[in-house]
Amino acid sequence: MNPKRSFQALILTLHNYWADKGCAVLQPYDMEVGAGTFHPATTLRALGPKPWRAAYVQPSRRPTDGRYGENPNRLQHYYQYQVILKPNPSNLQELYLGSLEAIGLDPLLHDIRFVEDDWESPTLGAWGLGWECWCDGMEVSQFTYFQQVCGIECSPVSGELTYGLERLAMYVQGVDNVYDLNFNGREGAEKISYGDVFLQAEQEYSRHNFEYANTAMLHQHFIDAEKECLALLAAGAPGDSSNNRLHKCVFPAYDQCIKASHVFNLLDARGVISVTERQSYILRVRTLAKACGEAFLLTEAGGANWNREAA
C-alpha cells in the first residue's frame, strides 16, 4: 500500500517500519485520553530500569479544540502515532528520518528542520527535552527525551516520537482540508474520505463538549474517579511480608487517573472552571499520576526485583 495514497496506508507503513526496529506494535488504549503519551505503554513503561520498545496509534481527544467540523485542520478528536524507545537510542534522529523516508518524505528532497521545543504535560507531571520536526515549513511531528514522568526522574531516559497523523497525511497527500483525505486508497465510488468517517462525529462531539455535557454529572465523575484511584492504590499496596512486596493494582488505578483527566478537559471545554480552579484540578490529577507512577515501580513491569545484569 502506498502511504501517499491513503490514511490507513500511512499507518500501516509506520507499523511495519517500527516493527522492523524491534518495537512491539500495540493497539490503542481503550479509554479517552488527551494524547498518545497517556497510554500506559508510555506513561508507566517510561519509568523504571527495564528496556521497552513500543509503537501504536492512539485516538486522542482535546475537547477545547473542537470547531464543529468547520476548521480544515483543527479537531477535537484526532490520531497520534506514538513510539517509545527505552533506553533512548543514540541514533534516534536517524531512525526518525528513516521513518519519514519510509512514508515518502525523502530528507534529501525536502527541507527538514528540527526546532527546539521542550515538552511538558502538567497533568502527568512529565517533561522532556524536545524538538519539533518541520518539513518544508510545516510541523509534522515531535520527538522528546523524557526527563521526568509522574513527577519521577526517568532512568534510563526514554526517547519518544509523536506523529500527528492527520497533519502528516495532509502533507503527503497534498490536501488542504483534513476531511478531504483519502482514507482507504480507493477512487471513485469506492473512495472513503476522512470526512466520510469522522465529520459527523466531529460536529456532534463539538456540540457535546461545548454545549450539552452535564457539568454537575462531570464534577461528580471527577470526584468518583479521584476517590477510586486512591482506593485502588491503597488496596493493592504491598504488605509487610516477604511474599507481598509488589503492588497489585496499578493499571486499574491509572485508568481512574485517565478518567479524571478527561473529565477535567470536558469541564474546561464547558467553561465552568475558573483560572484558580483549573490549577487545582491539574494538581489533583498530577497527584494521582505521581501515586500511580510510584506504585508502578513496585511491580515486576516497573523493575521491582529486576536484575539488570541477568537481563
From Swiss-Prot:
Keywords tagged on the record: Aminoacyl-tRNA synthetase, ATP-binding, Cytoplasm, Ligase, Nucleotide-binding, Protein biosynthesis
Q: How does it assemble?
A: Tetramer of two alpha and two beta subunits.
Pfam families noted in UniProt: tRNA-synt_2e (PF02091)
E.C. designation(s): 6.1.1.14
Gene of origin?
A: glyQ
Annotated compartments: Cytoplasm
Q: What is its main location?
A: cytoplasm
Q: Give the reaction(s) catalysed.
A: tRNA(Gly) + glycine + ATP = glycyl-tRNA(Gly) + AMP + diphosphate
Q: Which family does it belong to?
A: Belongs to the class-II aminoacyl-tRNA synthetase family.
Q: Which InterPro entries match?
A: aa-tRNA-synth_II/BPL/LPL, Gly-tRNA-synth_heterodimer, Gly-tRNA_ligase_asu
The lineage, from the top, is: Bacteria, Pseudomonadati, Pseudomonadota, Alphaproteobacteria, Hyphomicrobiales
What NCBIfam families would the database entry show? glyQ (TIGR00388), PRK09348.1 (NF006827)
The entry's protein name is Glycine--tRNA ligase alpha subunit
One GO cellular component assignment for this chain's record is: cytosol
Q: Which domain of life is it from?
A: Bacteria
GO process annotations (BP): glycyl-tRNA aminoacylation
GO MF assignments: ATP binding; glycine-tRNA ligase activity
Task: Give the source species.
Answer: Rhizobium meliloti (strain 1021) (Ensifer meliloti)
- Name the Gene3D superfamilies on file: Bira Bifunctional Protein, Domain 2 (3.30.930.10), Class II aaRS and biotin synthetases, domain 2 (1.20.58.180)
